[in-house]
A protein has these predicted regions:
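Phosphate/diphosphate-binding glycine-rich loops and adjacent basic-rich segments that engage nucleotide
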Residues: 1-41
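Glycine-rich, charged/polar anion/phosphate-binding loops
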Residues: 12-14, 48-50, 76-82
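A glycine-rich, aromatic-flanked flexible loop/lid motif
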Residues: 28-43, 58, 80-91
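Structural beta-strand/beta-sheet cores of well-ordered domains, especially the beta-sheet scaffolds
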Residues: 26, 48, 56, 90-94, ...
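Catalytic-core signal marking the mid-to-C-terminal active-site face
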Residues: 71, 76-164
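Oxyanion-binding "anion nests"
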Residues: 35-75
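Structured core elements
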Residues: 1, 51, 93-95
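Glycine-rich beta-alpha junction loops
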Residues: 6-9, 56, 98-100
Length: 164
């Protein structure tokens, strides 16, 4: 399963990074002067986020937005933020069962080989680790199941204020 924003970082990840007082690991968008930045607060001022994969990512992003919007008759990404809250956005889920094409054992072996190849890649930083897409989130889920879900205090206070 691949679940990802078609921008370099999702809006949620940009907000989370800002709330944690951190910078993005690589540029994720533009500031108000048109400069690439890793500062999530400056990106939130413009919401000019980088697409994944630059020009190829732009093509994929446009194609997926067209498919999702046409199939759901919901709002295109161009409408994000125009209604205040993010409502009525188009979403499409595509599920493919690889076991309809191969045995479970073969599928698992192929996946394990590919993940091992990814994990064997040279990390960007000496002593760093290479993660496959979704691995960090999987690790976070396992930690949360074991230890509970940490909530940023500012977000928790907002949730509590909704009770009143």
């Amino acid at each position: 399963m691949v679940d990802c924003a078609v921008s370099q970082f999702s809006y949620g990840k940009i907000e989370e990074t800002r709330l944690k007082g951190r910078q993005l690991p690589v540029p994720g968008g533009y500031d108000s002067e048109g400069n690439l930045t890793t500062d999530p607060a400056k990106i939130e001022e413009t919401w000019r986020v980088l697409p994944m994969g630059y020009w190829k990512g732009s093509g994929i992003s446009i194609a997926l937005d067209l498919i999702a919007t046409v199939l759901t008759n919901a709002n295109s990404v161009s409408k994000i933020g125009t209604f205040g809250d993010e409502v009525g956005l188009s979403q499409v889920m595509i599920a493919i069962d690889p076991c309809k094409f191969n045995s479970v054992e073969l599928t698992d072996r192929i996946v394990d080989e590919i993940l091992a190849d990814i994990k064997a890649s040279q990390p960007a930083e000496t002593g760093g680790e290479v993660f496959y897409p979704g691995e960090i989130e999987l690790n976070t889920r396992q930690e949360n199941l074991a230890n509970g879900i940490p909530v940023i205090d500012e977000v928790w206070q907002t949730i509590l204020s909704l009770e009143r």
